[in-house]
Amino acid sequence: MYTADAHCDALLKIAQSDSPLVNIDTLKKGGVGLQNFALFAPVESSIYEQQEMIKKEITLFHMCVKQSDNLHSNPFTFIKNDNTYTDAILSLEGAGMLGDNLDMWNDLKNKGVEMASLTWNERNNLAAGSSQPNRYGLTRAGKKVIQWQNNNNIVTDTAHLNEQSFWQVIELADTVVVSHTNTRALLDHPRNITDKQVAALVNKNGFIGLTFYPLFINGTNRADFSDFGRQVEHLCSIGASDIIGLGSDFDGISSTINGLSNPSDYPALINWLLARFDENIVEGLVGENFRKFWNRRRIKR
Ligand SMILES: [Zn+2]
């Protein structure tokens, strides 16, 4: 079945000379037709070091694509329902190292970045992340960057934002996703989203990627397919079945769902889901919803 994943941190792992769980072999075995690769630099390092890290990850991304027939990168073009290869897309997770320097944003777009979040969990010069109280939100510079994103058909990712920033993005941004999260209805964690936020994303024709991180799924270090299934069930019950998908966060999480240790395990998850949900729900969830969302906004350009 066509599978798509809206978030992984494999590039950081490769940049740190570690071997990623998301790689050519596991993508192939998992039937992954579409994989988003996030550019991320640890926020503790200096702005200069973060900029250098992002450059390094971009270079590594293009090297990987060049070296493998199985990875395709064609920014701003239509993505086919074909998982005999993987369409690799690029996003930026946290943009404190760019601030509102639009030359740098343009440069990133020219290198294939099509989606970006303003901040990680912290508060930076653009927005306030999920660790921050709601008296903080988007800054003037953050609003300017959203405007640039709208003008350049860049998707605004609200994963990691606090609620205040989220609602401001909903108001200002054209195309909004939460690339890797779970639901607060099932676990009240600052990285998860409320039913009200889900409804706003449905309204906006956005997208929600569900992570495999047990800490966000049930608050422990252990989760099973059934815990993941409960997230899906809840989202379907509040009318979000057409906008949900996978946002694994592989290579960015310290534990994962039992039986789902890397992309090669997707067929097992799919079989489990097919035994419990309608086929069209499963097809949407594991890939088609994200592919369609991505094509909708690419065509809009
Ligand atoms: Zn993240």
Segments (PLM) and residue ranges:
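An N-terminally biased module of ancient metal coordination in phosphate/nucleic-acid-related enzymes
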Residues: M1-N36
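Structural preference for beta-strand elements that scaffold enzyme active sites
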Residues: Y2-D5, L34, D87-S91, E114-M115, ...
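Conserved, mostly hydrophobic/aromatic
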Residues: H7, L27, G112, T156, ...
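Active-site beta-loop-alpha junctions enriched in small/polar residues
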Residues: H7-L11, F40-P42, S91-A95, N121-R123, ...
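A metal-dependent hydrolase metal-coordination microenvironment
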Residues: T26-D103, S130-Y136, R140-K143, Q147, ...
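Histidine/acidic residue-rich metal-binding segments in metalloenzymes
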Residues: D100-N110, Q132-V177, P190-K204, S226-D242
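Short acidic/histidine-rich active-site segments
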Residues: G239-L260
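Mid-to-C-terminal alpha-helical segments outside catalytic/metal-binding sites
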Residues: S261-R301
